[in-house]
Amino acid sequence: MFLINLLLLIVPVLLAVAFLTLIERKILGYMQFRKGPNIVGPHGLLQPIADAVKLFIKEPLRPLTSSIYMFILAPILALSLALTIWVPLPMPLPLIDLNLGLLFILSVSGLSVYSILWSGWASNSKYALTGALRAVAQTISYEVTLAIILLSIMLINGSFTLTTLNLTQEFMWLVVPTWPLMLMWFISTLAETNRAPFDLTEGESELVSGFNVEYAAGPFAMFFLAEYANIIIMNALTVILFFGTYHLIFLPELSTTNFMVKTMLLTSLFLWVRASYPRFRYDQLMHLLWKNFLPITLVTCLWYIMFPTMLSGTPPQM
């Protein structure tokens, strides 16, 4: 029974990832005054299936000087970690209800950088290694702000369990009192998922394709799936943290639809950002985090600790 539930979670995620690639190409196409994919199937709807078939029937080539085991394990690890993060998500009920669901998500998303590092190291290519080292520095840096923002949200929520966030936001979304945190969280998730304007790990103009430059066929497709699964999971987490999914008080049975629509809108915003902004320079990226985001998030975290402590001695007001 558990395996059936697991499949019912994984298969829709993979389908969503496949069609997200199509939506991205369509949106970028229309923003650049062209059509995008429109040949394969009606309005290009079968393009992701054609891409998947093409990639998985090709021969998975590898460089002669590469470390074979690590080279093959890296994309498998990337995809398995990207799918593991979905386990504690309440939609509205999680697959496994973890007491420390948020810590689990934070730690697993931090582990995903190992797959990038392994792929860059095992490829035995200077471009791949440079991209991988950039990814490590970027991910480790932005994990700090993500953790502090999560701590602030947990102080308001009073629990590390994701399902209690729905109850906390029954009457007001947390984005209203914590909108600066939400903006910093959204920008940090862009950096965490290596998306434009923070896609320094796969900078085409300088690193050919970054850490996955030596990959082809199936392993490349697995990296691709992992990247887009991470995009959807980060937006789903943003919805759970800041845009409570139980806000439809009169129709609670529509909470899953509500959750999906909000996640789709935030994912579209990711694509819009990619179409609009040029790539950041590396020193600007680090400056934004260590000199702007980190002090602000620390101050807000201290405020959320201090405010309830100050008011704890006051009598209840009528």
From Swiss-Prot:
Domain of life, per the record? Eukaryota
As given in the record, the signal peptide range reads none
Which principal EC class is assigned to this enzyme? Answer: translocase
Q: How does it sit in the membrane?
A: Multi-pass membrane protein
Sorted alphabetically, the Gene Ontology cellular component annotations on this record are: mitochondrial inner membrane
- Which reaction equations make up its catalytic activity? a ubiquinone + NADH + 5 H(+)(in) = a ubiquinol + NAD(+) + 4 H(+)(out)
User: What InterPro entries does the entry give?
Assistant: NADH_UbQ_OxRdtase_su1/FPO, NADH_UbQ_OxRdtase_su1_CS
Summary of the function given for this chain in its UniProt record: Core subunit of the mitochondrial membrane respiratory chain NADH dehydrogenase (Complex I) that is believed to belong to the minimal assembly required for catalysis. Complex I functions in the transfer of electrons from NADH to the respiratory chain. The immediate electron acceptor for the enzyme is believed to be ubiquinone.
| Gene source species | Tachyglossus aculeatus aculeatus (Southeast Australian short-beaked echidna)
Q: Name one GO biological process term.
A: aerobic respiration
Instruction: Write the protein's name.
Output: NADH-ubiquinone oxidoreductase chain 1
A molecular-function term among this protein's GO annotations: NADH dehydrogenase (ubiquinone) activity
The family database entries (PROSITE patterns) matched by this protein are listed as: COMPLEX1_ND1_1, COMPLEX1_ND1_2
